[in-house]
């Protein structure tokens, strides 16, 4: 009695858990169907027999099935054929795989291994969610692959003769879901994602989108599991987020239990993923993820501090101490309204105070205190130091811990106490057991009590050295008081203020912070990458299909501006301006002011010259754009001389903000700092303290990042700028805000080359600072699928004037590209 083989659909195991964003070439055409039919049966003796028929022969024979019995071959009329469905379809697709890959065996596998693998796959049930058509396609494909490997050497290859197995494989479109199902089951996740993304670009994929998305979601789950196994939590989290986006993109997939399981897993993984992302190197590539992690940490803290909200974190002291240890001092200060929380903590009988002690223990709050002192001292920010003093007073009242020295030190910095008082408190601290408590918090060994106490030594060892952004700051108290400035709180010297990642708001007050109605994004949404692209990519010249496909991109910002941006950009005049800005983005022309004709120590200004050619790829100022027509547009713009006209630059600025802001300011200002330095060279100069000059430049860089950043703090420009520089930068920042775009800046390196102070007969005292800056930035525009990025190393000369209140303000600048 012969044994007939039927192969039911088999699943892939859902592993609830990689990142795979590859793209591969994918060929789809529609030749006449030429498929060989091959049927394999096994006799009672266990031997396999095969017979092949072409599709045309099957049609002539009336779709008859061969069956082997007793060594003879009999024809059974009107029996169903697994190839019958192919006759109705002439659309085929090429898969970049071999038959061996489809069943999960190596190319060296013997025939018995092939049969065993097929039998094992046959016994496995399909994953929940696949359609019946996908199950049938999987069965047909599985049997077809087995037959080809057993009886057709072209597909099996020959190891001895070094003949590779045939690839790619051409199959009907109806078999694609079955192929993806098999590939996912045998562990070919990356192939599933590559083939799935490529297939979605073709119109023929429309009937199979449900099964394609499901296969891709399961592949991402498998990748996530592999990432978790090697402790790559953030990669696994992002893979799960991708799987979630695939399932949410199709209504029929949203009903699966798999989606619920993924969402629950993401909630549980939010805390460890936050720690993992905070531990990433502080590079421009990781800046976006780090901002998301900080926003997620803020949201987790909000949930923990809220009496009504629930949170996944069980051991708060352990979690929060690890998180704080991975933050910069400025990030700690901007994370929460710490002084308000400290005041709430004083009322020991309140429910909020009790709940806060569970979430934020004394050790964490002490590190927060040191962070405030570090930021306040390094940036000479009296308001931040005053907050540190408030925290001291509240912790003394609520915890009963002796923090008299820290309080006295803050009073000394605020000129509310003497150095002698602070030094006396330090001596008392060194001589009692409280110093051991502090050292244990900081993870330091106890210092010998015989050493002479020093405020500067304590400041360096116990405060500044604890945070990466203040570690290199000088602990000199003399410098602090010599050039003391009272900057507003938002002038951080290490990095721009940390805003709410989604809503672009500053940290809220305590009442607002614990009010869940003020927060529309969960920690999971904060951690989800903003660049999750829709898996549905329309085919070329198929806008109609693109419009009908669902988008699964996960938005982070609710403030998506839809005020006819596309109408503006697609208008003729705006399009010309857009092309012009792209040319500027693409590293074209800066106004380099040539200094020549140096006679008797005088600098004479040269006419502004504009280069008519784009910079080469080796130029240090390199814009990265995803536009395929960038080079073509750039050449066209340069030939027409659009970038050579200052008025046109101003008009383009009103249309869109897309260029390195320093360069755009210089062009639109129509004035160079050289004109002022000309007169300065004739006057008596005296050196300016390098640290003070560096501090001023850093202050300006931070203000620039805030004014052109997501919060558009245009008002802050007037605190550091004056004259024409203020007008031009205000125009630029206001235009960016009006166009709903903003810049993200990362200052990588700053070096003051020279700094001088001179007397200006008209304006009083003025200064000239020449600095070398290394900077990276990203232009964020919600209307564009990709953000323009640049990396630049440039030398810049600033002219500053001293105001009546004793503060310096930048008036003019002259930027030069470094080759």
UniProtKB/Swiss-Prot annotation:
Tissue specificity as recorded in UniProt: Exclusively expressed in young green tissues such as young cotyledons, shoot apex, emerging leaves and budding inflorescence.
Keyword Chloroplast belongs to the record: yes
Keyword RNA-binding: no
Compartments, record wording: Plastid, Chloroplast inner membrane
Residue ranges of coiled coil: 419-439, 762-782
InterPro entries the record matches: ARC6-like, ARC6-like_IMS
Topology Stromal: residue spans: 77-572
Transit peptide: 1-76
Consequence of gene disruption: Defects of chloroplast and FtsZ filament morphology (e.g. long FtsZ filaments formed by multiple rings or spirals); elongated chloroplasts with multiple division sites. Aberrant stromule biogenesis in the leaf epidermis associated with giant and pleomorphic amoeboid chloroplasts, typically having one or more constrictions as well as one or more extremely long stromules. Reduced number of enlarged etioplasts in cotyledons associated with the formation of multiple FtsZ-rings.
Superkingdom classification of source: Eukaryota
Intervals, Chloroplast intermembrane compartment: 594-819
Known function: Component of the plastid division machinery required for PDV1 localization to constriction sites. Involved in chloroplast division site placement. Required for the proper formation of FtsZ rings at the division site in nongreen plastids (e.g. etioplasts). Inhibits FtsZ assembly, functioning as an antagonistic regulator of FtsZ dynamics against ARC6, by recruiting ARC3 to the middle of the plastid to facilitate its interaction with FtsZ proteins. Required during stromule biogenesis in the leaf epidermis, especially in non-mesophyll cells plastids.
Self-association and partners: Self-interacts. Interacts (via N-terminus) with ARC3 (via MORN domains). Binds (via N-terminus) to FTSZ2 proteins, FTSZ2-1 and FTSZ2-2. Recruited ARC3 to the middle of the plastid where subsequent complex made of CDP1/PARC6, ARC3 and FtsZ proteins can form; this complex enhances the dynamics of Z rings during chloroplast division. Interacts (via C-terminus) with PDV1 (via C-terminus). Interacts with MIND1.
Name of the protein in its database record: Plastid division protein CDP1, chloroplastic
Species classification: Eukaryota, Viridiplantae, Streptophyta, Embryophyta, Tracheophyta
């Amino acid at each position: 009695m012969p044994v007939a083989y039927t192969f039911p659909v088999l699943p892939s195991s859902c592993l609830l858990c990689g990142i795979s964003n590859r793209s591969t070439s994918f060929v789809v055409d529609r030749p006449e169907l030429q498929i060989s039919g091959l049927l394999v049966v096994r006799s009672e003796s266990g031997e396999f027999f095969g017979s092949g028929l072409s599709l045309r022969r099957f049609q002539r024979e009336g779709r008859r099935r061969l069956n082997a019995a007793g060594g003879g071959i009999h024809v059974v009329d009107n029996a169903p054929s697994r190839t019958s469905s192919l006759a109705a379809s002439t659309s085929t697709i090429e898969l970049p795989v071999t038959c061996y890959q489809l069943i999960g065996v190596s190319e060296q596998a013997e025939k018995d291994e092939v049969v065993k693998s097929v039998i094992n796959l046959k016994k496995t049930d399909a994953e929940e969610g696949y359609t019946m058509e996908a199950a049938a396609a999987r069965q047909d494909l599985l049997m077809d692959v087995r037959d080809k490997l057993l009886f057709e050497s072209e597909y099996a290859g020959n190891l001895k003769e070094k003949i590779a197995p045939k690839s790619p494989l051409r199959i009907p479109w109806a078999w694609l879901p079955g192929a993806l199902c098999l590939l996912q089951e045998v562990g070919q996740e990356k192939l599933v994602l590559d083939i799935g993304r490529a297939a979605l670009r073709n119109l023929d994929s429309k009937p199979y989108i449900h099964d394609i998305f499901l296969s891709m979601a399961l592949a991402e789950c498998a990748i996530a599991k592999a990432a978790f196994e090697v402790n790559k939590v953030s990669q696994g989290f992002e893979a799960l987020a991708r799987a979630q986006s695939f399932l949410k993109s199709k209504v029929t997939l949203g009903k699966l239990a798999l989606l619920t399981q993924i969402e629950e897993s993401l909630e549980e993984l939010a805390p460890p993923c936050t720690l993992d992302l905070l531990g990433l190197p502080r590079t421009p590539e990781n800046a976006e993820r780090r901002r998301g992690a900080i926003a997620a940490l803020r949201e987790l803290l909000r949930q923990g501090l809220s009496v009504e909200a629930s949170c996944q974190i069980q051991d708060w002291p352990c979690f929060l101490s690890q998180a704080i240890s991975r933050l910069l001092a400025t990030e700690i200060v901007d994370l929460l309204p710490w002084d308000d929380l400290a005041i709430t903590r004083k009322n020991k009988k309140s429910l909020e105070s009790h709940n806060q002690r569970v979430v934020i223990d004394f050790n964490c709050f002490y590190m927060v205190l040191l962070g405030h002192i570090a930021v306040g001292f390094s940036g000479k920010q009296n308001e931040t130091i005053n907050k540190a003093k408030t925290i001291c007073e509240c912790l003394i009242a609520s915890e009963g811990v002796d923090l008299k020295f820290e309080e006295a030190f803050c009073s000394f910095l605020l000129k509310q106490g003497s150095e002698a008082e602070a030094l006396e408190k330090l001596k008392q601290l060194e001589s009692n057991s409280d110093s051991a408590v502090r050292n244990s918090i900081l993870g330091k060994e106890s210092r010998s009590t015989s050493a002479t106490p020093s405020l500067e030594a304590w400041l360096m060892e116990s405060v500044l050295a604890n945070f990466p952004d203040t570690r290199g700051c000088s602990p000199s108290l003399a410098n602090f008081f010599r050039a003391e400035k009272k900057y507003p709180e938002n002038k951080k010297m290490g990095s721009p203020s940390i805003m709410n990642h989604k809503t672009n708001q500053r940290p809220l007050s305590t009442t607002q912070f614990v009010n869940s109605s003020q927060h529309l994004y969960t920690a999971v949404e904060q951690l989800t990458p903003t660049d999750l692209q829709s898996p549905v990519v329309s085919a070329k010249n198929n806008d109609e299909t693109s419009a009908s496909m669902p988008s699964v991109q996960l938005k982070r910002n609710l403030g998506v501006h839809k005020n006819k941006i596309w109408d503006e950009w697609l208008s003729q005049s705006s399009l010309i301006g857009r092309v012009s800005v792209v040319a500027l983005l693409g590293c074209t022309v800066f106004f380099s002011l040539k200094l020549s004709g140096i006679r008797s120590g005088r600098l004479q200004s040269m006419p502004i010259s504009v280069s008519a050619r784009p910079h080469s790829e080796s130029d240090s100022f390199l814009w990265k754009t995803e536009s395929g027509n960038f080079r073509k547009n750039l050449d066209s713009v340069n030939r027409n001389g659009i970038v050579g006209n200052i008025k046109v630059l101003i008009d383009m600025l009103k249309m869109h903000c897309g260029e390195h802001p320093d360069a755009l300011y210089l062009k639109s200002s129509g004035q160079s700092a050289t004109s002022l330095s000309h007169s300065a060279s004739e006057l008596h100069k005296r050196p300016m303290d390098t640290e003070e000059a560096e501090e001023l430049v850093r202050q300006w860089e931070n203000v620039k990042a805030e004014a052109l950043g997501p919060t558009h703090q245009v008002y802050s420009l007037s605190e550091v700028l004056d004259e024409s520089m203020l007008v031009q930068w205000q125009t630029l920042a206001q235009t960016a805000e009006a166009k709903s775009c903003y810049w993200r800046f990362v200052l990588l390196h700053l070096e003051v080359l020279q700094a001088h102070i001179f007397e200006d007969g008209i304006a009083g005292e003025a200064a000239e600072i020449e600095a070398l800056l290394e900077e990276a930035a990203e232009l964020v525009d919600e209307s564009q699928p990709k953000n323009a990025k640049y990396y630049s190393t440039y030398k810049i000369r600033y002219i500053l004037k001293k105001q009546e209140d004793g503060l310096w303000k930048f008036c003019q600048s002259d930027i030069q590209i470094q080759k």
